[in-house]
Protein backbone atom coordinates (compact mmCIF):
# COMPACT_ATOMS: atom_id res chain seq x y z
CA UNK A 1 0.00 0.00 0.00
CA UNK A 2 1.31 3.45 -0.93
CA UNK A 3 2.19 5.78 1.91
CA UNK A 4 0.50 9.19 2.15
CA UNK A 5 3.86 10.84 1.54
CA UNK A 6 4.26 8.81 -1.65
CA UNK A 7 0.84 9.86 -2.93
CA UNK A 8 1.52 13.49 -2.04
CA UNK A 9 4.96 13.64 -3.60
CA UNK A 10 3.75 12.39 -6.97
CA UNK A 11 2.29 15.86 -7.55
CA UNK A 12 5.49 17.40 -8.84
CA UNK A 13 5.89 20.74 -10.64
CA UNK A 14 5.66 20.80 -14.44
CA UNK A 15 9.38 21.59 -14.76
CA UNK A 16 10.42 19.11 -12.04
CA UNK A 17 11.25 21.75 -9.38
CA UNK A 18 9.96 25.05 -7.99
CA UNK A 19 10.48 27.34 -5.00
CA UNK A 20 8.81 24.81 -2.70
CA UNK A 21 11.00 21.84 -3.62
CA UNK A 22 12.48 20.30 -0.46
CA UNK A 23 15.69 18.39 -1.08
CA UNK A 24 17.43 15.60 0.80
CA UNK A 25 21.03 14.61 0.06
CA UNK A 26 21.95 10.93 -0.26
CA UNK A 27 25.71 10.60 0.05
CA UNK A 28 26.97 13.33 2.39
CA UNK A 29 30.70 12.89 1.77
CA UNK A 30 32.98 15.73 0.68
CA UNK A 31 31.16 16.34 -2.60
CA UNK A 32 27.73 16.05 -1.04
CA UNK A 33 28.67 18.52 1.69
CA UNK A 34 30.25 20.98 -0.73
CA UNK A 35 27.41 21.05 -3.24
CA UNK A 36 24.68 21.06 -0.60
CA UNK A 37 26.25 24.24 0.77
CA UNK A 38 26.31 25.85 -2.69
CA UNK A 39 22.69 24.85 -3.25
CA UNK A 40 21.61 26.45 0.01
CA UNK A 41 23.58 29.60 -0.77
CA UNK A 42 21.72 29.80 -4.08
CA UNK A 43 18.36 29.52 -2.31
CA UNK A 44 17.46 25.84 -2.57
CA UNK A 45 15.63 24.30 0.39
CA UNK A 46 17.96 21.47 1.45
CA UNK A 47 16.29 19.92 4.49
CA UNK A 48 18.51 17.00 5.46
CA UNK A 49 20.78 14.14 4.46
CA UNK A 50 20.88 10.36 4.83
CA UNK A 51 23.74 8.32 6.30
CA UNK A 52 22.85 5.08 8.14
CA UNK A 53 25.90 5.27 10.45
CA UNK A 54 25.68 8.97 11.32
CA UNK A 55 21.98 9.41 12.08
CA UNK A 56 21.30 12.05 14.71
CA UNK A 57 24.37 14.13 13.88
CA UNK A 58 24.62 17.48 12.16
CA UNK A 59 26.96 17.50 9.15
CA UNK A 60 27.58 20.60 7.03
CA UNK A 61 24.65 22.21 8.82
CA UNK A 62 22.23 19.43 7.85
CA UNK A 63 20.44 16.97 10.14
CA UNK A 64 21.40 13.38 9.31
CA UNK A 65 18.78 10.64 9.15
CA UNK A 66 19.10 6.86 9.13
CA UNK A 67 17.10 6.20 5.97
CA UNK A 68 14.86 7.83 3.37
CA UNK A 69 11.57 6.89 5.02
CA UNK A 70 12.64 8.67 8.19
CA UNK A 71 13.79 11.83 6.41
CA UNK A 72 10.52 12.06 4.45
CA UNK A 73 8.49 11.65 7.63
CA UNK A 74 10.52 14.25 9.54
CA UNK A 75 11.18 16.89 6.85
CA UNK A 76 8.45 16.56 4.21
CA UNK A 77 11.17 16.25 1.56
CA UNK A 78 9.96 15.62 -1.99
CA UNK A 79 13.20 15.45 -4.00
CA UNK A 80 16.48 13.61 -3.58
CA UNK A 81 19.98 14.38 -4.85
CA UNK A 82 22.31 11.38 -4.97
CA UNK A 83 26.09 11.51 -4.54
CA UNK A 84 26.39 7.88 -3.45
CA UNK A 85 29.35 6.05 -5.11
CA UNK A 86 28.54 3.81 -8.08
CA UNK A 87 28.29 0.44 -6.23
CA UNK A 88 25.48 1.75 -4.01
CA UNK A 89 23.91 4.41 -6.21
CA UNK A 90 21.23 2.21 -7.78
CA UNK A 91 20.07 1.05 -4.35
CA UNK A 92 19.94 4.70 -3.23
CA UNK A 93 17.75 5.59 -6.23
CA UNK A 94 15.39 2.74 -5.46
CA UNK A 95 15.22 3.62 -1.75
CA UNK A 96 14.35 7.22 -2.61
CA UNK A 97 11.61 6.23 -5.03
CA UNK A 98 10.08 3.72 -2.62
CA UNK A 99 10.13 6.31 0.18
CA UNK A 100 7.90 8.60 -1.87
CA UNK A 101 10.25 10.97 -3.65
CA UNK A 102 8.65 12.63 -6.65
CA UNK A 103 12.06 13.49 -8.12
CA UNK A 104 15.46 11.81 -7.90
CA UNK A 105 18.55 13.45 -9.41
CA UNK A 106 21.53 11.09 -9.62
CA UNK A 107 24.93 12.67 -10.19
CA UNK A 108 26.87 9.40 -9.87
CA UNK A 109 28.85 8.06 -12.83
CA UNK A 110 29.76 4.45 -13.73
CA UNK A 111 26.60 2.80 -12.39
CA UNK A 112 26.38 -0.69 -13.95
CA UNK A 113 23.83 -0.82 -16.76
CA UNK A 114 22.18 -3.91 -15.30
CA UNK A 115 21.56 -1.96 -12.07
CA UNK A 116 20.00 0.90 -14.04
CA UNK A 117 17.51 -1.47 -15.67
CA UNK A 118 16.26 -2.32 -12.17
CA UNK A 119 16.16 1.38 -11.24
CA UNK A 120 14.11 2.34 -14.28
CA UNK A 121 11.63 -0.45 -13.52
CA UNK A 122 11.11 0.89 -9.99
CA UNK A 123 10.78 4.46 -11.26
CA UNK A 124 8.05 3.38 -13.64
CA UNK A 125 6.23 1.44 -10.92
CA UNK A 126 6.35 4.29 -8.39
CA UNK A 127 5.86 7.25 -10.74
CA UNK A 128 9.07 8.86 -9.48
CA UNK A 129 10.93 11.02 -12.02
CA UNK A 130 14.64 10.24 -12.40
CA UNK A 131 17.15 12.69 -13.86
CA UNK A 132 20.54 11.14 -14.62
CA UNK A 133 22.60 9.24 -13.74
CA UNK A 134 25.94 10.77 -14.72
CA UNK A 135 24.42 14.22 -15.04
CA UNK A 136 25.04 17.74 -13.68
CA UNK A 137 21.46 18.09 -12.44
CA UNK A 138 19.01 20.91 -13.12
CA UNK A 139 18.54 24.56 -12.27
CA UNK A 140 15.65 27.04 -12.30
CA UNK A 141 16.95 30.62 -12.09
CA UNK A 142 13.55 32.20 -11.48
CA UNK A 143 13.02 30.32 -8.22
CA UNK A 144 16.72 30.10 -7.25
CA UNK A 145 16.39 26.33 -7.03
CA UNK A 146 18.94 23.79 -8.22
CA UNK A 147 19.75 20.15 -7.64
CA UNK A 148 23.23 19.13 -8.63
CA UNK A 149 26.64 20.53 -9.45
CA UNK A 150 25.68 23.23 -11.96
CA UNK A 151 27.51 26.55 -11.38
CA UNK A 152 24.97 29.31 -10.77
CA UNK A 153 26.73 32.52 -11.82
CA UNK A 154 26.02 32.20 -15.57
CA UNK A 155 22.26 31.69 -15.23
CA UNK A 156 19.53 34.34 -15.37
CA UNK A 157 15.76 34.03 -15.18
CA UNK A 158 14.29 34.09 -18.66
CA UNK A 159 12.60 32.41 -21.61
CA UNK A 160 14.79 29.55 -22.86
CA UNK A 161 14.54 25.92 -21.78
CA UNK A 162 17.74 23.91 -22.21
CA UNK A 163 17.92 20.11 -22.26
CA UNK A 164 21.33 18.52 -22.66
CA UNK A 165 23.27 15.27 -22.54
CA UNK A 166 26.49 17.23 -21.94
CA UNK A 167 27.32 19.13 -18.75
CA UNK A 168 29.86 21.60 -20.12
CA UNK A 169 27.86 22.33 -23.27
CA UNK A 170 24.89 23.07 -21.01
CA UNK A 171 26.94 25.85 -19.44
CA UNK A 172 27.96 27.11 -22.90
CA UNK A 173 24.30 27.40 -23.94
CA UNK A 174 23.32 29.03 -20.66
CA UNK A 175 26.08 31.63 -20.90
CA UNK A 176 25.15 32.39 -24.51
CA UNK A 177 21.46 32.87 -23.73
CA UNK A 178 22.30 35.04 -20.73
CA UNK A 179 24.59 37.20 -22.88
CA UNK A 180 21.82 37.49 -25.48
CA UNK A 181 19.43 38.81 -22.83
CA UNK A 182 17.12 35.80 -23.14
CA UNK A 183 17.90 33.97 -19.89
CA UNK A 184 16.59 30.53 -18.96
CA UNK A 185 13.33 29.13 -17.61
CA UNK A 186 14.71 25.76 -16.52
CA UNK A 187 17.88 23.92 -17.54
CA UNK A 188 18.03 20.12 -17.35
CA UNK A 189 21.16 18.02 -17.77
CA UNK A 190 19.83 14.55 -18.55
CA UNK A 191 23.24 12.85 -18.58
CA UNK A 192 25.08 10.76 -21.12
CA UNK A 193 24.51 7.19 -19.93
CA UNK A 194 22.65 4.61 -22.06
CA UNK A 195 19.86 4.17 -19.47
CA UNK A 196 19.00 7.77 -18.60
CA UNK A 197 15.94 8.54 -16.50
CA UNK A 198 14.81 11.38 -18.76
CA UNK A 199 15.33 11.58 -22.51
CA UNK A 200 15.13 14.72 -24.64
CA UNK A 201 11.48 14.16 -25.52
CA UNK A 202 10.45 13.82 -21.87
CA UNK A 203 11.87 17.24 -21.05
CA UNK A 204 10.80 18.95 -24.29
CA UNK A 205 7.19 17.92 -23.66
CA UNK A 206 7.38 19.80 -20.37
CA UNK A 207 8.96 22.85 -22.02
CA UNK A 208 6.20 22.80 -24.65
CA UNK A 209 3.54 22.94 -21.92
CA UNK A 210 5.31 25.60 -19.85
CA UNK A 211 4.16 29.20 -20.52
CA UNK A 212 7.46 30.75 -19.37
CA UNK A 213 9.51 28.67 -21.81
CA UNK A 214 9.30 30.41 -25.19
CA UNK A 215 12.29 28.78 -26.91
CA UNK A 216 14.29 25.56 -26.53
CA UNK A 217 17.91 24.52 -26.97
CA UNK A 218 18.51 20.80 -27.44
CA UNK A 219 22.06 19.54 -26.93
CA UNK A 220 22.70 15.97 -27.94
CA UNK A 221 25.53 13.55 -28.55
CA UNK A 222 26.27 10.69 -30.88
CA UNK A 223 24.83 7.34 -29.87
CA UNK A 224 21.33 6.21 -29.01
CA UNK A 225 18.10 7.55 -30.52
CA UNK A 226 17.03 10.19 -27.98
CA UNK A 227 17.55 13.07 -30.42
CA UNK A 228 15.80 11.28 -33.31
CA UNK A 229 12.86 10.46 -31.05
CA UNK A 230 12.67 14.11 -30.02
CA UNK A 231 12.72 15.15 -33.68
CA UNK A 232 9.79 12.83 -34.38
CA UNK A 233 7.75 14.34 -31.53
CA UNK A 234 8.64 17.91 -32.54
CA UNK A 235 7.57 17.21 -36.13
CA UNK A 236 4.33 15.50 -35.08
CA UNK A 237 3.29 18.37 -32.80
CA UNK A 238 4.63 21.14 -35.10
CA UNK A 239 6.27 22.59 -32.00
CA UNK A 240 8.62 24.92 -33.89
CA UNK A 241 5.66 26.88 -35.23
CA UNK A 242 5.02 28.04 -31.66
CA UNK A 243 8.36 27.67 -29.90
CA UNK A 244 11.68 27.74 -31.78
CA UNK A 245 14.14 24.91 -31.20
CA UNK A 246 17.90 25.05 -31.82
CA UNK A 247 20.02 21.89 -31.68
CA UNK A 248 23.70 21.02 -31.44
CA UNK A 249 25.05 17.45 -31.55
CA UNK A 250 28.44 16.69 -30.02
CA UNK A 251 30.77 14.05 -31.44
CA UNK A 252 30.40 14.70 -35.17
CA UNK A 253 34.04 13.76 -35.77
CA UNK A 254 33.97 10.52 -33.76
CA UNK A 255 34.99 7.39 -35.70
CA UNK A 256 32.50 4.47 -35.58
CA UNK A 257 32.92 2.29 -32.50
CA UNK A 258 34.88 4.93 -30.58
CA UNK A 259 33.28 6.12 -27.34
CA UNK A 260 33.46 9.91 -26.93
CA UNK A 261 33.33 10.75 -23.23
CA UNK A 262 29.99 9.42 -22.00
CA UNK A 263 29.13 5.73 -21.98
CA UNK A 264 26.24 6.33 -24.38
CA UNK A 265 28.23 8.44 -26.84
CA UNK A 266 29.18 5.77 -29.34
CA UNK A 267 28.22 5.10 -32.96
CA UNK A 268 27.69 1.42 -33.74
CA UNK A 269 26.08 -0.44 -36.61
CA UNK A 270 25.77 2.79 -38.59
CA UNK A 271 23.24 4.17 -36.09
CA UNK A 272 23.46 7.14 -33.74
CA UNK A 273 25.56 9.36 -36.01
CA UNK A 274 25.61 13.13 -35.66
CA UNK A 275 24.57 13.53 -39.31
CA UNK A 276 21.60 11.22 -38.83
CA UNK A 277 20.47 13.22 -35.82
CA UNK A 278 20.95 16.55 -37.61
CA UNK A 279 18.95 15.30 -40.58
CA UNK A 280 16.03 14.19 -38.40
CA UNK A 281 16.00 17.41 -36.39
CA UNK A 282 16.27 19.66 -39.44
CA UNK A 283 13.37 17.83 -41.10
CA UNK A 284 11.32 18.58 -37.97
CA UNK A 285 11.92 22.33 -38.35
CA UNK A 286 14.72 22.60 -35.80
CA UNK A 287 17.46 25.18 -36.45
CA UNK A 288 20.80 23.38 -36.56
CA UNK A 289 23.90 24.83 -34.90
CA UNK A 290 26.96 22.91 -36.10
CA UNK A 291 29.21 24.89 -33.78
CA UNK A 292 28.33 25.34 -30.09
CA UNK A 293 29.23 29.01 -30.33
CA UNK A 294 26.18 29.56 -32.54
CA UNK A 295 23.56 28.22 -30.12
CA UNK A 296 22.86 31.58 -28.49
CA UNK A 297 22.94 33.51 -31.76
CA UNK A 298 20.58 31.13 -33.52
CA UNK A 299 17.99 30.92 -30.73
CA UNK A 300 17.99 34.73 -30.56
CA UNK A 301 17.37 34.90 -34.32
CA UNK A 302 14.60 32.30 -34.14
CA UNK A 303 12.92 34.06 -31.22
CA UNK A 304 13.03 37.30 -33.18
CA UNK A 305 11.64 35.60 -36.30
CA UNK A 306 8.61 34.39 -34.34
CA UNK A 307 8.10 37.81 -32.73
CA UNK A 308 8.94 36.65 -29.22
CA UNK A 309 11.52 39.41 -28.61
UniProtKB/Swiss-Prot annotation:
GO terms for cellular component: hydrogenosome lumen; mitochondrion; succinate-CoA ligase complex (ADP-forming). Its EC number is 6.2.1.5. It catalyses: succinate + ATP + CoA = succinyl-CoA + ADP + phosphate. It holds the Pfam family Ligase_CoA. The active site is at 262 (tele-phosphohistidine intermediate). GO terms for molecular function: nucleotide binding; succinate-CoA ligase (ADP-forming) activity; succinate-CoA ligase (GDP-forming) activity. Residues 1-9 form a transit peptide. Gene3D superfamilies: NAD(P)-binding Rossmann-like Domain, Succinyl-CoA synthetase domains. Pathway: Carbohydrate metabolism; tricarboxylic acid cycle; succinate from succinyl-CoA (ligase route): step 1/1. GO terms for biological process: tricarboxylic acid cycle. The keyword S-adenosyl-L-methionine does not apply. It is found in: Hydrogenosome lumen. CoA binds at residues 54, 107-109. Keywords: Hydrogenosome, Ligase, Nucleotide-binding, Transit peptide, Tricarboxylic acid cycle. Substrate binds at residue 171. Belongs to the succinate/malate CoA ligase alpha subunit family. Heterodimer of an alpha and a beta subunit. This is Succinate--CoA ligase [ADP-forming] subunit alpha-2, mitochondrial.
Amino acid sequence: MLSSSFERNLHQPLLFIDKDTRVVIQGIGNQGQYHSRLMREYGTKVVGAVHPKKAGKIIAGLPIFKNMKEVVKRTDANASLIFVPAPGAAAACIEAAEAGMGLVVCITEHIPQHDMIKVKKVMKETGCQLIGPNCPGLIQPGTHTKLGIIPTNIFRNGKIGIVSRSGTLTYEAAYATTQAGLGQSTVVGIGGDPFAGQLHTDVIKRFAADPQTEGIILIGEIGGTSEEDAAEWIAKTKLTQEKPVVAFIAGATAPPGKRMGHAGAIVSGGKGTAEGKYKALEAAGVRIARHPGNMGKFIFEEMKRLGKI
